[in-house]
């Protein structure tokens, strides 16, 4: 092999290496990384797919219990979404220096609901039916439902209602909605599940929904925030705008969120 051929091959290899590096960098710039809990995930994922297709880019969504994605989010999160205001505060603590909590934007609300077994064998029609001694109720103690059952049961200021409801709760409480779903699937003797309505929309085969009656109905929101990294990316900003656009509202409405 002569010197000219060697130089040519070396130059070609260097060019291909640089091209691959540039291609990888371009691909990274064309992707945004989104992290958050499982509750809002079906709507976020559908929105990500629609936005990505329209803009010829990738929107990566990692959702579920925080411990499954928090380490990766520390490295490359552009956007973080939550299932309640207390969750966004927790994410700010878990991702120190990643974003300004004051920049978080509430997007949509959803109501608490009562999920029952298919066919509603206990004939549950409202919250007071959950106070009957023979009813077993599944609740969640953490994530976006921290304090949820107490807020619902305490709405009237009647401590007797709080006491009666607590006696019917299944202990220990589920740590998050995903764990609650597993309990609901495995423990067939549980009669009702106090959770956000969106979980029935996403899992219609597992339960029927009984809308929460007043005065016990409460709402919590899903919020979104750009990280400092994401704030430097126009496409990340555009995706946040898309989530709250008419097209985004339609998607969230499909998954049970109140988009008024």
Where is each model-derived feature located?
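Exported/periplasmic ABC-transporter solute-binding proteins
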Residues: 27-62, 67-77, 84-85, 91-93, ...
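Bacterial N-terminal signal peptides that target proteins for export
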Residues: 2-12
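Bacterial N-terminal signal peptides
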Residues: 11-21
């Amino acid at each position: 092999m002569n010197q000219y051929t060697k130089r040519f091959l070396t130059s070609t290899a260097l060019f291909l290496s640089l091209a691959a590096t540039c291609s990888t960098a371009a691909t990274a710039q064309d992707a945004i990384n989104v992290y958050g809990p499982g509750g809002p995930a079906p709507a976020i994922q559908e929105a990500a797919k629609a936005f990505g297709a329209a803009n010829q880019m990738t929107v990566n969504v990692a959702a579920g219990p925080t411990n499954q994605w928090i380490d990766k989010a520390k490295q490359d999160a552009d956007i973080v979404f939550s299932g309640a205001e207390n969750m966004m505060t927790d994410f700010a603590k878990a991702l120190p220096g990643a974003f300004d909590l004051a920049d978080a934007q509430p997007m949509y609300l959803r109501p608490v609901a009562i999920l029952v077994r298919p066919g509603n064998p206990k004939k549950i029609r409202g919250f007071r039916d959950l106070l009957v001694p023979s009813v077993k109720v599944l609740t969640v103690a953490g994530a976006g439902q921290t304090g949820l059952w107490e807020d619902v049961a305490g709405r009237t200021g009647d401590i007797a209602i709080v006491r009666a409801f607590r006696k019917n709760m299944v202990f220990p409480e589920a740590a998050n909605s995903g764990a609650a779903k597993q309990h609901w699937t495995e423990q067939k003797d549980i009669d009702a599940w106090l959770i956000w309505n969106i979980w029935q929309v996403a899992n219609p085969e597992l339960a029927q929904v009984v809308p929460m009656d007043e005065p016990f109905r409460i709402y919590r929101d899903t919020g979104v925030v750009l990280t400092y990294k994401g704030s430097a990316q126009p496409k990340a900003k555009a995706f946040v705008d898309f989530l709250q656009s008419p097209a985004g509202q339609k998607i969230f409405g499909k998954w049970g969120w109140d988009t008024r």
